Amino acid sequence: MTAAPDARTTAVMSAPLAEVDPDIAELLAKELGRQRDTLEMIASENFVPRAVLQAQGSVLTNKYAEGLPGRRYYGGCEHVDVVENLARDRAKALFGAEFANVQPHSGAQANAAVLHALMSPGERLLGLDLANGGHLTHGMRLNFSGKLYENGFYGVDPATHLIDMDAVRATALEFRPKVIIAGWSAYPRVLDFAAFRSIADEVGAKLLVDMAHFAGLVAAGLHPSPVPHADVVSTTVHKTLGGGRSGLIVGKQQYAKAINSAVFPGQQGGPLMHVIAGKAVALKIAATPEFADRQRRTLSGARIIADRLMAPDVAKAGVSVVSGGTDVHLVLVDLRDSPLDGQAAEDLLHEVGITVNRNAVPNDPRPPMVTSGLRIGTPALATRGFGDTEFTEVADIIATALATGSSVDVSALKDRATRLARAFPLYDGLEEWSLVGR
């Protein structure tokens, strides 16, 4: 005779979040409201489709699966093996790569694994200087990459704010790195991957391209692909790619064994199978015409914002655009000649309903918690459905705020921003779906 279910266990397992933990439920509801009613313009953020939320909130969160499909250290992996293979196959197809590892928990973990596979502690790593737009994992002294490896850096031209490939070559010839990283966190232009490949070959280095920010543009065919040129390519799955917060690695088959081993057991234990399911969904979406259209609107929106912020009324207030424009999804704003610093400008835009992040400009004189710049991104608004008309309005709100400064009519600008946000509903009906149990 089968025993009756324990009533206490049944209650906990079936009760909605709002009943089990009303504090967290209330905070989720507030955050949903914030995302709905503000204009999200942090370049590294995006909105995932409901299908990705469902995959990441699925029963796969229960499953441990150390190892690779067909070679697990746990039983019961017959279904998650198929999930991971789908994600790997979709990543390879989307980027035209020979192999893919979809297990990294983040872009930083992906970079850690690649460097683990390609070099040994104490060997030389050459990357873009953090002060010129590089990422923490490209050699910053407090990061693992700065502690494990001997680091050299290339930068941007002080006048044009562009990467000078002749200068990169000269630095590489002198420094003789084991690995060169081409990639960025705050650089608004397309990189010359062929030139980086040539330099790497000349000095006997491996080339890692970190395409975390522009992977979605590459997937849509709107940005040159680094895959034919690089030995290995790392990326996040959020940002322009529009999936959940996580990472992946693609590249040449000859590095697959070393990288797989560097991910597990080198850097991580068990993969997050619910997150990998979300990656698989995001990668499927990224192969669609609708996704390509979203990326076109992302690029167009960034150019509209850059153009508006270079207009005479804004320039007169001491605001400029780093490198004189953008080729990608973000605009880097220079406030060194403005009464506003980066923190003050971020706070001001937050008041009017636009979320951005303060960001250092090349060779910024201010400390990193203050900065002299802003990084403004368009992916999240393009995901909501914004086109040129809406981005023109957003650009004018930002321009008015930055040009006018602390005396701006915050209420009037916030009304404009809120109207725009509410014209493009986000996650309509999500409360009833499950998150807050209403």
Curated annotation (Swiss-Prot):
Gene Ontology CC: one annotated term: cytosol
Record localization: Cytoplasm
pH dependence: Optimum pH is about 7.8. Is completely inactive at pH below 4.0 and above 10.0.
Predominant location category: cytoplasm
GO biological process terms, semicolon-separated: glycine biosynthetic process from serine; glycine metabolic process; L-serine metabolic process; symbiont-mediated evasion of host immune response; tetrahydrofolate interconversion; tetrahydrofolate metabolic process
Residues at which (6S)-5,6,7,8-tetrahydrofolate binds: L130, G134, H135, L136
Keywords: Amino-acid biosynthesis, Cytoplasm, One-carbon metabolism, Pyridoxal phosphate, Transferase
Superkingdom of source: Bacteria
Residue stretches in coiled coil: none
Catalyzed reaction equations: (6R)-5,10-methylene-5,6,7,8-tetrahydrofolate + glycine + H2O = (6S)-5,6,7,8-tetrahydrofolate + L-serine
Keyword Methyltransferase assigned: no
CDD domains: SHMT (cd00378)
Pathway where it operates: One-carbon metabolism; tetrahydrofolate interconversion; Amino-acid biosynthesis; glycine biosynthesis; glycine from L-serine: step 1/1
One GO MF term attached to the UniProt entry: protein homodimerization activity
Pfam families: SHMT
Cofactor: pyridoxal 5'-phosphate
EC number: 2.1.2.1
Keyword Amino-acid biosynthesis: yes
PANTHER family linked to this entry: SERINE HYDROXYMETHYLTRANSFERASE (PTHR11680), SERINE HYDROXYMETHYLTRANSFERASE 1 (PTHR11680:SF35)
NCBIfam families linked: PRK00011.1 (NF000586)
Function: Catalyzes the reversible interconversion of serine and glycine with tetrahydrofolate (THF) serving as the one-carbon carrier. This reaction serves as the major source of one-carbon groups required for the biosynthesis of purines, thymidylate, methionine, and other important biomolecules. Also exhibits THF-independent aldolase activity toward beta-hydroxyamino acids, producing glycine and aldehydes, via a retro-aldol mechanism. Thus, is able to catalyze the cleavage of L-allo-threonine.
Quaternary structure annotation from Swiss-Prot or TrEMBL: Homodimer.
Family: Belongs to the SHMT family.
Identification of the protein by name: Serine hydroxymethyltransferase 1
Species the sequence originates in: Mycobacterium tuberculosis (strain ATCC 25618 / H37Rv)
Gene from which the chain derives: glyA1
